Structure formats: structure tokens, C-alpha cells
């Protein structure tokens, strides 16, 4: 028994120390019996912050938010059995978004697998469709090889925590009873750092010269790290190229004349220009209309993404580069004789007129977009916005026009689950206001517990149209009218004031845009600001804006 305890202690203390060595500073633990050894090891480590969350699904998304906010890998830990399965949505989001989430699932020892033992399911390779690396660790014993396996596996897995290969990894860790390590053996807990991998690349620009010397070019930038924007702006300025900037690109925070923000509304309203080449940077953009245009254009398409698994959506490019945006555009700098002034001015003219139409529209509108426009106005430069999927991110795409705020969202799998938890995780490291719809909010109300338990301050702006507003824009509304409200509208009739009381949030309800205009978003307390809207009215008012922009484009071109 003594040998078992010593071996278990050495294994879990070494594992915790190795995670620290590769940059982990936070671990989110969902309580359970089988995870006792590692939970105690993390709690005992002097330089690792532990968070406790009883809901594994929300806990995993909270960790995703911590990673987004800290830009470091974060680990999650749960007990054996179905607890682990609840991690799946957040792991899928992390895989598509290249988020270094370290998944630690505790397991029964090998002799208790597949024999009907309680709280035992097959956890080996259970996330193999969504993780970049996975390993079933050996059980603790007295051998040197068991400890060596930790060093070997962490070194292999570290390539997925940084650089172009980033993504979630999974370690399954079986433990035998008794489960308590020796908490007095703290000399085994170390805080030494490893040399982290560094990636640097350049390209031979000569292969692109004949393409880039053409006149009508566009730079389209999707979700990417804010450190990557400098050279995009420099290149655009030197070579007079318009930048169509997604709200998650971190480019709309710059008041730069080449940054085009209204493109989704312009394409939605009938814009169709001939283009010679497109440089696509980062993740795919949110705008459905821009993605549809990319699928049909004859323009030569160059894709630049700083990861090893290229996301080619909406269409495979003519050429792609695995390289950072800064390195790519730095490699392209050279003298050129191409005069693109008239091409750039055409886009700048459309942008200016588009903004004017949006401003006029918002002065009269009473729909959800008017609420969103007011929220953007009220958000200070010290704060960031976390935007839920479905309609909120689309309204922000259309209405965020060069304001110095950062915008974040879960745009990997684009699901509505885990939004509250992800935003709260980010709120640990940044001042965050969450914009979310009522169905997405309902889906992750459990996540609010972390604010209550840990005094995490975050304001929530809740657009409540009592259902799924985005479906009003889809063909189902016209083709399935008899069944639409029950199958797609999905009204719940929930009173979220009780949710606020349950989790100790302040609560304010607004029935009109004029009421919300006079409100102040407080930074000292956590408040839910519920904005009551109407789905049908929201749809009709959006159509008015599209028509106005269509007329403007027709008159301009």
C-alpha cells in the first residue's frame, strides 16, 4: 500500500509539474472521486490556479474562455464515466478554432474496464474525431518508465499547444484505489519552464508577382489573433488594397480608410464587382453573402492561415500558405507600378455611403439592430464584446464600424452551447460584455454559477425575442408556415428575472430602444440587461435596410 501511494504521488505531482512547465497556469476541475489524485496535485501546486465547476459541459467552455483571455493553454479535469462525454462540444469548438485545450479524463484501472464496473465507459479515443493528440497513460507503479512516459508524452503533445499546430489534446488517466496522494511530498511539485516551440516562416513572393501586379485586388480577413494585423494594414496602405474586415479580425478597431466594414450589407443588397485576385487571411468570415460571392467569383484566390490544417471554406483557393499574416505580407513588400487608386476609391465611396444609410436607418429603427447599435455605442474602449452565435453576431457584423473595441465569439463549430461559460472565462482576464439571444442564454444558464462562486464581473445584454429569430430569414418560414412557430420559432416564455436572482445578478428589463438609450452599463456589478424584441418586426425592418442599400448601390455604380 505504501508503494502504491508513493508511486501515485510521484505520477500525479510530476504530471502537474509538466503541465506547468509547458505553460499551463489554470485548471478547471469538475469534482468527482476518480479524479482525486490529479485534483489534489493541481490544488497543491503553488503556481497553478484551480477553478471548480460542477457542470462538465460549462466547465469546458469556461476553460475555452480562459484560453481566449490569457492566450495560454488551460487544462480541464473530470472523473470517470459519462462526465467526460460532456466535454465533447467544447472540444469540437476547440478543434475547429485551434484552441489549446488540455483534456484530462480520469478513468477506472484497466482491470475494471468492460466488466460492468460502475461509472466506467470506454474513454480511450473517445474524442478522436476532435483532438490533435491523445494518449491513454499507464497506471501508477514503481517503474521509471511510467514517469518517463509523462515526459515523453508531454513533449510530443506540446507541439499542439503553440504555433500552427494548435488544438485540443486528450490524456486519459486510470487510477487505482486508494486515490489520495501524499500531500506532504511537495518537493515533487516543480515550477520550471520548458523551452517552448517557436515557428517562423517566409515565402518566395516571385511565384505571386504576376497575380499581385493586377489592379483589382481585395484582402479579406476573418477571425485571427490581434498580433497579426500590423503588416496587413501596412501592405494595404502601400498598395492601395481594400480590406474587407470581419468583426473578429480585430481590424475594425482601427480608423483606417482602407478597412471596409459594410461589405455584408453591400453584397446582400446586390453588389457584384469584377475582381482579379483575393488574399484571404485567417478563418472563414461570418458573412454568408461574402462567402457565396467567393464561391462564384473567377478571381485568383490566395489563402493565408497560420496553422497546419487549412480551412478552405467556402471554396478551395488557387494557392495556400501556412504562415502568419505578418510574415506573409512582410515577404511581399517590393516596388510596384500598379495604380489602384480608382479601385480603392470605388470601395471607399461604397463604404462611406453604406455607413450613411446605416446611420439613417438606426436613427429610426426599433428592432434588434437598433439595440445592438446602442450597445456598440455604450461599450467603452476598455471593454471587449463577446458575441453569441445566430443573429447577434450577424448584427454586429453589419453594425460595428471602426470602433476601438475587441470582439470575440465561438466561431469554430458556431454552436449556441457554452456561450455564457466561454464569456465568463474570458472575463477573468478581460472586461467583457456578453451579447446573447434568449435561446443561447437558456442553453448555458448553468454557466452563470462561476460568476456567483468566484465573483467574476460581467454584464450580459440579452436579446429576448422569445425564440429563434434567425429562422425568420431562412426558406423554412415561407415553405413550412403551418409548422414554423413550433419547429423553428421555439418560443419558451421564460422569465429570466428569476435566473438573475438565482445566480445573484442584477436585472433590468427594457421594452424599447428609447429606454435602453438612457441606460448606463455598470462596470462594478454583474447585470443582465434584458431587451424585449419582436421577431417579425425585426425581420421586416431588416428588409427595409437591405432595400435602401440596394438603391444606393444601383445609384452609385
UniProtKB/Swiss-Prot annotation:
InterPro entries: MenaQ_synth_MenD (IPR004433), MenD_middle (IPR032264), THDP-binding (IPR029061), Thiamin_PyroP_enz_TPP-bd_dom (IPR012001), TPP_enzyme_TPP-bd (IPR011766)
Cofactor remark: Binds 1 thiamine pyrophosphate per subunit.
GO molecular function, one term: magnesium ion binding
Cofactor(s) annotated in UniProt: Mg(2+); Mn(2+); thiamine diphosphate
SUPFAM superfamilies, A to Z: Thiamin diphosphate-binding fold (THDP-binding) (SSF52518)
One Pfam family named in its UniProt record: TPP_enzyme_M_2
Record-level GO BP terms: menaquinone biosynthetic process
Reaction catalyzed: isochorismate + 2-oxoglutarate + H(+) = 5-enolpyruvoyl-6-hydroxy-2-succinyl-cyclohex-3-ene-1-carboxylate + CO2
Disulfide topology: none
Biological pathway: Quinol/quinone metabolism; 1,4-dihydroxy-2-naphthoate biosynthesis; 1,4-dihydroxy-2-naphthoate from chorismate: step 2/7; Quinol/quinone metabolism; menaquinone biosynthesis
EC number(s) on file: 2.2.1.9
Top EC category: transferase
Keywords: Magnesium, Manganese, Menaquinone biosynthesis, Metal-binding, Thiamine pyrophosphate, Transferase
NCBIfam families registered for this protein in UniProt: menD
Function: Catalyzes the thiamine diphosphate-dependent decarboxylation of 2-oxoglutarate and the subsequent addition of the resulting succinic semialdehyde-thiamine pyrophosphate anion to isochorismate to yield 2-succinyl-5-enolpyruvyl-6-hydroxy-3-cyclohexene-1-carboxylate (SEPHCHC).
Quaternary organization: Homodimer.
Similarity comment text for this entry: Belongs to the TPP enzyme family. MenD subfamily.
PANTHER family for this protein: 2-SUCCINYL-5-ENOLPYRUVYL-6-HYDROXY-3-CYCLOHEXENE-1-CARBOXYLATE SYNTHASE, PROTEIN PHYLLO, CHLOROPLASTIC
Protein name, per record: 2-succinyl-5-enolpyruvyl-6-hydroxy-3-cyclohexene-1-carboxylate synthase
Encoding gene (name): menD
Amino acid at each position: 500500500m505504501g508503494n502504491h501511494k508513493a508511486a501515485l504521488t510521484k505520477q500525479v505531482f510530476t504530471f502537474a509539474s509538466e503541465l506547468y512547465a509547458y505553460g499551463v497556469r489554470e485548471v478547471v476541475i469538475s469534482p468527482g472521486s476518480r479524479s482525486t489524485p490529479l485534483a489534489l496535485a493541481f490544488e497543491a501546486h503553488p503556481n497553478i490556479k484551480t477553478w471548480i465547476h460542477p457542470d462538465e459541459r460549462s466547465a469546458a467552455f469556461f476553460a475555452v474562455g480562459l484560453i481566449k483571455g490569457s492566450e495560454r493553454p488551460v487544462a480541464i479535469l473530470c472523473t470517470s464515466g459519462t462526465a467526460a462525454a460532456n466535454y465533447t462540444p467544447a472540444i469540437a469548438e476547440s478543434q475547429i478554432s485551434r484552441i489549446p485545450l488540455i483534456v484530462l479524463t480520469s478513468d477506472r484501472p484497466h482491470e475494471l474496464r468492460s466488466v460492468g464496473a460502475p461509472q466506467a465507459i470506454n474513454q480511450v479515443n473517445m474524442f478522436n474525431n476532435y483532438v490533435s493528440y491523445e494518449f491513454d497513460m499507464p497506471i501508477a507503479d514503481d517503474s521509471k518508465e511510467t514517469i518517463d512516459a509523462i515526459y515523453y508524452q508531454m513533449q510530443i503533445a506540446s507541439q499542439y499547444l503553440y504555433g500552427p499546430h494548435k488544438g485540443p489534446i486528450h490524456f486519459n488517466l486510470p487510477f487505482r484505489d486508494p486515490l489520495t496522494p501524499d500531500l506532504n511530498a511537495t518537493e515533487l511539485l516543480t515550477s520550471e519552464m520548458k523551452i517552448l516551440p517557436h515557428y517562423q516562416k517566409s515565402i518566395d513572393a516571385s511565384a505571386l508577382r504576376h497575380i499581385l501586379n493586377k489592379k483589382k485586388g481585395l484582402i479579406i480577413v476573418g477571425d485571427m489573433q490581434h498580433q497579426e494585423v500590423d503588416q496587413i494594414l501596412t501592405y494595404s496602405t502601400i498598395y492601395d488594397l481594400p480590406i474587407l474586415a470581419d468583426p473578429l479580425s480585430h481590424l475594425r478597431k482601427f480608423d483606417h480608410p482602407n478597412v471596409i466594414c459594410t461589405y455584408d450589407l453591400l453584397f446582400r443588397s446586390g453588389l457584384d464587382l469584377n475582381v482579379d485576385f483575393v488574399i484571404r487571411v485567417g478563418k472563414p468570415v461570418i458573412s454568408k453573402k461574402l462567402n457565396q460571392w467567393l464561391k462564384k467569383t473567377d478571381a485568383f484566390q490566395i489563402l493565408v492561415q497560420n496553422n497546419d490544417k487549412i480551412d478552405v471554406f467556402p471554396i478551395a483557393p488557387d494557392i495556400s500558405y501556412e504562415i502568419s499574416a505578418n510574415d506573409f505580407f512582410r515577404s511581399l513588400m517590393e516596388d510596384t507600378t500598379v495604380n489602384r487608386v480608382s479601385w480603392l476609391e470605388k470601395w471607399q465611396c461604397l463604404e462611406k455611403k453604406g455607413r450613411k444609410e446605416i446611420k439613417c436607418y438606426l436613427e429610426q429603427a426599433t428592432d434588434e439592430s437598433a439595440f445592438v447599435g446602442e450597445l456598440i455605442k455604450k461599450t467603452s474602449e476598455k471593454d471587449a464584446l463577446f458575441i453569441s452565435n445566430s443573429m447577434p453576431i450577424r448584427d454586429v457584423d453589419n453594425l460595428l464600424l471602426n470602433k476601438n473595441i475587441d470582439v470575440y465569439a465561438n466561431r469554430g463549430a458556431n454552436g449556441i452551447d457554452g456561450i455564457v461559460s466561454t464569456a465568463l472565462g474570458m472575463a477573468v482576464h478581460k472586461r467583457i460584455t456578453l451579447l446573447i439571444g434568449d435561446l443561447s442564454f437558456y442553453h448555458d444558464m448553468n454557466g452563470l454559477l462561476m460568476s456567483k462562486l468566484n465573483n467574476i464581473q460581467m454584464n450580459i445584454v440579452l436579446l429576448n425575442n422569445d425564440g429563434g429569430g434567425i429562422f425568420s430569414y431562412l426558406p423554412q418560414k415561407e415553405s413550412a408556415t403551418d409548422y414554423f412557430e413550433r419547429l423553428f420559432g421555439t418560443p419558451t416564455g421564460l422569465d429570466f428575472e428569476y435566473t438573475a436572482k438565482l445566480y445573484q445578478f442584477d436585472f433590468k428589463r427594457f421594452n424599447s430602444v428609447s429606454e435602453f438609450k438612457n441606460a448606463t452599463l455598470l462596470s462594478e456589478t454583474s447585470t443582465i440587461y434584458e431587451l424585449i424584441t419582436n421577431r417579425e418586426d425585426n425581420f421586416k425592418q431588416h428588409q427595409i435596410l437591405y432595400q435602401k442599400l440596394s438603391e444606393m448601390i444601383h445609384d452609385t455604380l
